[in-house]
Every structure is written in structure tokens, then in C-alpha cells.
Amino acid sequence: MMRVRHLCLHGSVFSVDVRLLQVDGRWLASADAPDGPSLGLGRLPEEALIEALEPFAGIIDELMESVPDEFYWARAGR
């Protein structure tokens, strides 16, 4: 069974709705960007999220800081 995880990442000015899905050992992320959905793919969920957040260059780190604690990988190595 596939489970889509919905997240709302917060920046100082606005928030971004994203979805994460694991498919065949890879992660797919979709972020609601101003020009439509932005997709990211990665071996790790963090990689997929960062790629999907590319339209928000300059505040990606700030948005990633708001990833809920249940996603421990977002804090690893930082």
C-alpha cells in the first residue's frame, strides 16, 4: 500500500504544501509552486524534497528547517 505524506513547510513569508511518496525504493516529492507543481525524485526523501523546492531558491534551507521532527533525516548531518 502506498502512503502519500502531506507536509506544509513554512518560511518567514509564506508556506509551501508538499507531498511525499515512496515508490520502488525511491522518493517522489511534489511541491505547490507558483507556476504549477514542481517535482523531485531521490533515493532519500530529503533529496526529493530539495529538488521539488527548486522554484523557491534562496529559502530552501528555511523551508527544510520546518520539516516535522518525525522526518529525522532532515536534521541529520546539519
Q: What is each of the regions a protein language model found here?
A:
Residues 53-66:
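Short arginine-rich
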